[in-house]
C-alpha cells in the first residue's frame, strides 16, 4: 500500500468511526481492507454480507476521503472474501449426508420479516450488548453463544434482532433451514400434530433446523403445558447437540420463568443472557430520525425532540405516534410536521398512555414550587447552586415532565435555557429520590395539589 493509499484508508476509517456507533463500526467496518487505489477506483475487501451496509452508509465517507487525499471522486469496487460466517454458516453436517440422502426433510417456511436487519437497528447503550451478541451469533451460528437469550419489555427491539439474525444468516447461506416462530405458535403446532397423530412430522420440521428463533418464550411457562415443554426440551437438545443455533426472547430472565421446568431454565442459561432496557432520550431521537425516512414529510428537529420526550417506555409508542401524525398530515395535506401538528396528532395516544397529563403552564409549576421551597421563579431559572434552589429547580423540572406534554428541550428552555440532558438528569434524580424518601413524596403531592 502506498503512502497516499494508507492516508486515504486511515481517513476513511476515521470518518466512519466518527459517524457510526462503536458496535456498528466494529462489525461492519473494522475488518474491511483496502487492496489498492487505481485510477479513481478503490478496491476494498470485505464480507459480501456487509456490502449493502457500505453502499447505503459509507459511500459519502469514501468520497470525502478521496477528495481530501487524491483531489478526485473515488468510486468503490468490492472484492469478497470467503468469510467465516460463510464457511461456518449453518449447514447439514457431513455425518448425516448418507442419512439425509434417502430422507426428504419437510419444507420449512422461515417466516422471517425481511424489513428487519442489523443495518436499520438503532443502537444505544440500552441495547448495545444485545446487538453485539446478535451480530456475533449471526456471524458464527452455533459456535459463540448458544443459546442466545434476549430479555426485556415489549417494543424494545427483541423481535427486530431475532429477524435480523435470521436474515443475516440467510444472506450468508440461502440454503440454511431457518425458522422464526413465537412460542404461542409453537404450542399451537404441537397441539395440531398431537391431534393429527403426526408427531414425526413436527420432529422432522424443528429438529433438523440450522437456526431456531423463538419469540416470547415466556408463553411456554405454564404448568398446563408440561407435554409441550417436554417436546421443546427434546427439540432444544437435538439442535444444541448438533451445534445448531438457538435464539430465544422473553419479557423476563430465565430464572423468572415460573412454571417452566428447571431443566429448560438451566439450558436457557447455557449460552449468553442479555437485557434490553427502554431507550434513553438520545436513542429515541435516533430511532425517530431513522423511522421518519419511511414517511414523505419533513420533520423539524424540534418536533423530533418533542416526540422523543413524550414516549419513553418503548419503540412501539414512537412508531404509533408517527402513524398518528401521518394520518393528520394526510388529512390536512401537510408537508412539514411542526411541534403543534405533532401535539395535536398524538393527544389521544398520550391520554391513553398517560392519563395524568394535564395542560398546565410551566410557569404555574415554577410559581408553586417556588412558594413551597421559599425561592423565586427568577432564582429557579438562575445558575445559583444553593441547596434549596437546586432542589426546587429539579422538582420543578420533574413536575413539568410529569404534568405537561412539553418536550425536554422545551422544559429546559423554560428553566433558564438548560438543555434536555439537564432536564433528564433532574427528572431521574427526583424519581430515584421519591422511591426512597417518603417525606419528599408528601411534599410532591402537596405541590401537585396546589398546581391543580
Curated annotation (Swiss-Prot):
PROSITE patterns registered for this protein in UniProt: DNAA
Q: Segment Domain IV, binds dsDNA: which positions?
A: 330-452
The segment annotated Domain II runs over 84-110
Q: Mainly resides where?
A: cytoplasm
**Chain spans, region Domain III, AAA+ region:** 111-329
Entries under InterPro entries matching the protein = AAA+_ATPase, Chromosome_initiator_DnaA, Chromosome_initiator_DnaA-like, Chromosome_initiator_DnaA_CS, DnaA_C, DnaA_dom, DnaA_N_sf, P-loop_NTPase
This protein's GO CC annotations: cytoplasm; plasma membrane
Keyword entries, A-Z? ATP-binding, Cytoplasm, DNA replication, DNA-binding, Lipid-binding, Nucleotide-binding
Region named Domain I, interacts with DnaA modulators: 1-84
Write down the superkingdom of origin.
Bacteria
**Per its record, what are the GO molecular function terms?**
ATP binding; ATP hydrolysis activity; DNA replication origin binding; lipid binding
Q: Where in the cell is it found?
A: Cytoplasm
User: Biological process (GO) annotations?
Assistant: DNA replication initiation; regulation of DNA replication
Binding of ATP: at which residues?
A: 155, 157-159
Entry domain remark: Domain I is involved in oligomerization and binding regulators, domain II is flexibile and of varying length in different bacteria, domain III forms the AAA+ region, while domain IV binds dsDNA.
Stated role: Plays an essential role in the initiation and regulation of chromosomal replication. ATP-DnaA binds to the origin of replication (oriC) to initiate formation of the DNA replication initiation complex once per cell cycle. Binds the DnaA box (a 9 base pair repeat at the origin) and separates the double-stranded (ds)DNA. Forms a right-handed helical filament on oriC DNA; dsDNA binds to the exterior of the filament while single-stranded (ss)DNA is stabiized in the filament's interior.
- Its family? Belongs to the DnaA family.
- Kindly state the subunit structure of this protein: Oligomerizes as a right-handed, spiral filament on DNA at oriC.
Name of protein: Chromosomal replication initiator protein DnaA
Which classification does the entry list for the species? Bacteria, Bacillati, Bacillota, Bacilli, Lactobacillales
